[in-house]
Amino acid sequence: MTRHNEIIKCAEKYQLHIQPQTISLNESGLDFQVAFGKDKHGVEWVLRLPRRPDVYKRTKPEKQTVDFLQKNVSFEIPKWKVHAKDLIAYPKLTGKPAATIDPEIQNYVWEIEHKPLPENFINTLAETLVDLHNIPEENI
């Protein structure tokens, strides 16, 4: 069974019907292999598959943080639809990353112009930081 088929089979256990021809892999993570793919409705998904059994237990604080932020900030946060020992899955966020990690060169590859950084990037980052700092203390 190919890795793509394994990913499809794993996702189907959670009623995610990822189209095989849409799957692409990101091997840069140490703890998770990440696959991107579209379901039959055209929704793009992020599928995180743990590389080792010990990884799952460390996802609980991450899940708590994601859930907390969704209730307390206005910027886009992943909405985990699956949080299981063999898969974390959520619809892909809009936009594009500023940079990605290339495992071959073991460094970042910029996806945006970064010399200098665009004003929109700086403004968006500043708005995000303000949003985080405005979380009421009683919510923390």
Predicted features, each with a name:
Residues 22-140:
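ATP-binding pocket architecture of kinase catalytic cores
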